[in-house]
Amino acid sequence: MSPEEWTYLVVLLISIPIGFLFKKAGPGLKRWGAAAVGLGLTLFTCGPHTLHSLVTILGTWALIQAQPCSCHALALAWTFSYLLFFRALSLLGLPTPTPFTNAVQLLLTLKLVSLASEVQDLHVAQRKEMASGFSKGPPLGLLPDVPSLMETLSYSYCYVGIMTGPFFRYRTYLDWLEQPFPGAVPSLRPLLRRAWPAPLFGLLFLLSSHLFPLEAVREDAFYARPLPARLFYMIPVFFAFRMRFYVAWIAAECGCIAAGFGAYPVAAKARAGGGPTLQCPPPSSPEMAASLEYDYETIRNIDCYNTDFCVTVREGMRYWNMTVQWWLAQYIYKSAPARSYVLRSAWTMLLSAYWHGLHPGYYLSFLTIPLCLAAERQLESALRWRLGPGGQKAWDWVHWFLKMRAYDYMSMGFVLLSLRDTLRYWASVYFCVHVLALAALGLGLALGRGGPGRRKSGAPAPSPASGKLREE
């Protein structure tokens, strides 16, 4: 592991005992204590580059104050424009930020765009209320008022997920501050249930990255290996990539769980990133609070089992980096300048690649996803319904295998980063996933789409496994 990876791990691990300290604290101590810890971590890891996050926060707050009715689009333009400046600093002859600064900036961008959207929703609701002349009560998830500058700073620098996620809305943050009877919210047992696979994933990461180092792919000797060996190598590389993020995101979720952050009654049917989808009145007594069943779906960032064993490329996206996927769906996909599912997905993947960075490998990887989505959707609707139950089960296993190989292939761009290294590797395996996706798309178009009833009856199974294994 690199020194940077050790630093990330230490930050994640110390967040767990800190969470237990803050869990039962009052709103004021939670707000300012969590912000002080987060700011301290930022200053320690980023040093003077912390100024970038401060400038981004102040700029967004100014836009919210100046144009509350359109601040969402303005905040999106401002934060994404600042990302371009932030990543071009070395080209401008300015000091290059640390990797930790980049991590803080990425999560901060998501939080500030979401905050602006929540403020805009509040402004629209207030205007509708004034026009109608009566109040219907606060809609689900609406903010009580526009956050002040200090409140915006406290949300932005809250230590929870400050470098690794999960992303959370300001409404989720407020619910944590104002959580009634936090002592009744379970933490230790949910944390242990969530944390148990992390040591195994960590060992698998160390083993796979040692046996199959990524640097080997950049060496000329690698391309003298036979084709089967080159094809196989992307499998353990992506495996190590997954194990690394599984450990990081599970540890980040455990930090949230320790603090009771993102805990809602199961009846609220919370979604990762978005929070509750059903109104659930707060408990009126400690006994009532203790009788409720809670979950931490709001801050759930990874579903390890379904990431590995779901059938389709589309499902695989849904279970990976789940809170960020919610953000992309809510703020990018829904406002995409196209109506086609594939084109909207391409737009979303383009901005996702930009959010990650300027390395060409990001764009090569992310912009391969829409092709895979189009291919699997077209072939699914044209062919799967023609098969019997046994044939559909076999189809799903083959589909799952190809989905995993597609992600293996695309991950090489994500980890190799450069245009030369990515294209060199893909060329060495004859751009197999691109060729296969184009062939599947062509076959699906040639066969045509099935009838609506047939497509519905031939819907893919959620997983090729016989039963659904959950980690919690």
From Swiss-Prot:
This protein's encoding gene: MBOAT7
Enzyme nomenclature, EC number: 2.3.1.-
Reaction catalyzed: a 1-acyl-sn-glycero-3-phospho-(1D-myo-inositol) + an acyl-CoA = a 1,2-diacyl-sn-glycero-3-phospho-(1D-myo-inositol) + CoA; a 1-acyl-sn-glycero-3-phospho-(1D-myo-inositol) + (5Z,8Z,11Z,14Z)-eicosatetraenoyl-CoA = a 1-acyl-2-(5Z,8Z,11Z,14Z-eicosatetraenoyl)-sn-glycero-3-phospho-(1D-myo-inositol) + CoA; (5Z,8Z,11Z,14Z)-eicosatetraenoyl-CoA + 1-hexadecanoyl-sn-glycero-3-phosphocholine = 1-hexadecanoyl-2-(5Z,8Z,11Z,14Z-eicosatetraenoyl)-sn-glycero-3-phosphocholine + CoA; 1-octadecanoyl-sn-glycero-3-phospho-(1D-myo-inositol) + (5Z,8Z,11Z,14Z)-eicosatetraenoyl-CoA = 1-octadecanoyl-2-(5Z,8Z,11Z,14Z-eicosatetraenoyl)-sn-glycero-3-phospho-(1D-myo-inositol) + CoA
Entries under Pfam families matching the protein: MBOAT
Membrane topology, Lumenal segments: 23-33, 94-194, 262-426
Complexes and interactors: Interacts with SPTSSA; the interaction facilitates MBOAT7 location to mitochondria-associated membranes (MAMs).
Region (Disordered): 450-472
Species this chain originates from: Bos taurus (Bovine)
Protein name per its UniProtKB record: Membrane-bound acylglycerophosphatidylinositol O-acyltransferase MBOAT7
GO biological process, one term: layer formation in cerebral cortex
